[in-house]
Amino acid sequence: MVKKYLYILAVAAFAFTSCINDESTEGGDGVSVISLQTPLNSTYTLNQGDTLKITPTVLQSNGKQKLTYEWEVNHKLVSSDTALVYPIQNSGTYTGRLRLSNGQNIQIYEFTVNVEYAYTKGIYLLAENNSKAILSYVPTEGVNKEFHLDVLASNNPNINFGTPCSMAWSKSIGSQTNNILVIAAGNPSTLYQLDSYEMLSVFQTPVNEKVIQVEANSDPSSSKVMAITKNNLYSLGLNTTTLVSQTSRFTNAVGGSVTFASYMTPWWRDDLFYAHGDAYFDNAHGALLASAIENTAVPAEILKGTFTGDTLVGMGSVDKQRKMALITCQKSSGTFYFTYLFPGYYSSSADKRIAANVVYRIAMPSTSGIANGSVVRSARSKNIVYYTNGNAVYAHNVLANSNFPTTALFTVGNSTEKIVDMAFSDDDNLIYVATNDTSASMPGSLYCYDTQTNSLRWSKQHITGRIVKALYRNK
């Protein structure tokens, strides 16, 4: 008798269990089982600020029942709509889940959301639009990103950036390079330190005069940028608002006030791969100035008397940054000079020092295309100095001595455009040329040329406001 009751109880329990399975997962007679016509992706990758969009097609095996949707991202319910349309502002990796139910069957689908930084490799154009600074992001070769006209206002709605002055990449203490962007804007200027992956202003430092140039200091042990004004040089420690004047080093050297040119050029030691000093130029005295990086033995002025009476057109480092090239204009005669020099090695041990010397200083002929206002940039890993005249680009190999070009290497865009800046890829094989066309409502354009063939790779015309500076970012 006991065995009979145990048998009946076992049969009943089995039947009850089967009913639960039929209703929840298996889909027996009359149960409508849920499935997806196309499986969800295992991973959805998008850029920061983009909208995650998933539109599944849901199938039911035995008639259409009313469906309920529950979309979760990062363990939070974000939608109950049939399709997920969800903007994601923060980068990172998140778990996603879709829960579907029709009252008879429940299905759960999981996926991963990978949100990448929106602003990475590419060209950044600091420009003026409606009397305010904007920062345009132009993705470069092989970068699956979108062009942004202005990444400043959208990420900093409560900041009124003034007219643009300059900008520079730098780094934060203990972190990777190029993750801090310093922008100078306004007159008098403010220095804005931005987290360059999200373009959020994290520090603001007022300067009581107009900044004409911002450059990253070359000292690897000290994260700071240099702000150049007409008569002063300041250092700004990153992740701080500490602005320190560095001017007295140079006024003491030249015996009076200085008028800084808007250039800074580092040079490296012959035997090591880091900076030995940073060079500046004083237009008031015609002096090549130096800021010590490796040690304090670096003098404040190099090759005294060489540039007396000259103003700087532009300068840059060449020969893997071991030497320097300067183009200057002698104020009294209007003659342009190309000076190729070794800036010296200043060891802390006097017997190991190597004096600076001029390799050559040659007057540039009128046929060379040089002019006051020319943009001068150097391919640092090579021996080539590029300079501009209007929309034309010229190039001089420093090893060619007095054999200056008489025709342009190439011309950019239309005759109404004027080149305002040039930037190089890390290997110097690509040169990005920024122009302004005052006849256009959006004057700023960008062109990419191959420096091996001098051919145009691509162009993006009239994409931004009046460009002030262009920077290349490698990742």
Model regions: which residues?
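Solvent-exposed loop segments of extracellular immunoglobulin-like
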Residues: 62-70
